[in-house]
Regions:
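Mid/C-terminal beta-alpha module of Rossmann-like enzyme folds, strongest
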Residues: 194-245, 250, 277
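Catalytic helix-loop patch of NAD(P)-dependent Rossmann-fold dehydrogenases
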Residues: 73, 77-81, 101-144, 149-150, ...
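C-terminal amphipathic/interface module of NAD(P)-dependent oxidoreductases
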Residues: 232, 247-281
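N-terminal Rossmann NAD(P)H-binding glycine-rich loop of SDR-like oxidoreductase domains
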Residues: 1-19
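SDR active-site strand-loop-helix element
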Residues: 4, 27, 52-56, 93-99, ...
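NAD(P)-dependent short-chain dehydrogenase/reductase
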Residues: 135-185, 192
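Adenosine-cofactor binding site in Rossmann-like domains, unifying the SAM/SAH pocket
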Residues: 19-42
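NAD(P)H-binding glycine-rich loop region in Rossmannoid oxidoreductase-like domains
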Residues: 34-74, 85-88
Length: 281
């Protein structure tokens, strides 16, 4: 199993979990520049992996918006290069897409894969373009449209700003959080994603919604998660932001019925938070 992006938020956890279960080759940018096709081909030719979990990416959506050429080189061309090299050695590819492909859709309710994505951001457009390019190279490759993910704030592995980190920081520092009331999205425990990747090896090729469902607004989600964490009076320091997304609510909430039909399921967002906080309950 070759894992790209092995020093990042997701890739580090994938490498940690599957080491010992597979012969893991954990690759970071220092070992392979995915924007350079020949660099990718050399490394794949050396290791000839049976399975590739492609996590390397520019995942900061704001950075991608400010640096569109770099985002395209890494997120689109980089994934295309990995797909080509993987196909050349006969490996099974699982690569990461995003719920951001839906960030321009105006439909309400959880969105299934049958809805045509209409991304309006650089990151979302790049992810959708990546899906098309990979599908043309290797129809058996599996793309996973991930939600925003979190881990416990005390994790020794790399942490990004996420639901639990943001809540703890605001509560401990006594600062205010403004959270959108007109945004709907799933938020998923990264460990739930990691432990379900192995089952994806059996999936037919294509793009799948992959993460926790959630029918609450982002504001409601933050309030309820704060209560689960035992952070007092969340309505006093988590403030509703009704000004974001004025034209229509931003709906990234995904319907995961398709992945569920293959025996892969996730708890909804709040149940996932509860399990993360109280794992033995």
């Amino acid at each position: 199993m070759l894992i790209t992006g092995a020093h990042g938020f997701l890739g580090a956890r994938v490498a940690q979990y599957y080491t010992g279960r597979y012969e893991v080759i954990a690759i970071g940018h220092e070992e392979m520049d995915i924007s350079d096709l020949e660099s990718v081909r050399r490394l794949f030719g050396q290791h000839r992996p049976d399975v590739v979990i492609h996590c390397a990416a520019i995942s900061d959506t704001g950075y991608a918006e400010r640096h569109p050429e770099e985002s395209f080189a890494v997120n689109v061309l980089g994934t295309e290069h990995v797909a080509r090299a993987c196909a050349e050695v006969g490996g099974k590819l699982i690569y990461m897409s995003s719920d951001q492909v839906y960030n321009g859709n105006d439909e309400s309710g959880p969105l299934p894969e049958s809805v045509e994505p209409c991304p309006v951001s650089v990151y979302g457009r790049d992810k959708l373009e990546t899906e098309a390019r990979v599908r043309a190279i290797d129809p058996t490759a599996v793309g996973l449209r991930l939600t925003w993910m979190y881990d416990l704030p005390d994790s020794p592995l790399k942490l990004n700003r996420n639901l639990l980190v943001n809540l703890r920081q605001a509560y401990q520092e006594g600062t205010l959080l403004r959270v959108a009331t007109r945004e709907y999205r799933g938020i998923t425990d990264v460990r739930a994603v990691v432990t379900r990747l192995e089952a994806c090896l059996r999936l037919p090729g294509g793009a799948y919604n992959f993460g926790s469902e959630n029918r609450l607004s982002s504001y409601e989600t933050f309030i309820q998660a704060a209560r689960l964490l035992g952070y007092g009076a969340p309505e006093r320091w988590i403030l509703p932001d009704a000004e974001r997304f004025p034209e229509h609510p931003r709906n990234l909430a995904m319907d995961i019925s398709r992945i569920r039909s293959y025996g892969i399921d996730f708890p909804d967002t709040l149940e996932g938070v509860r399990r993360a906080i109280f794992p033995s309950a």
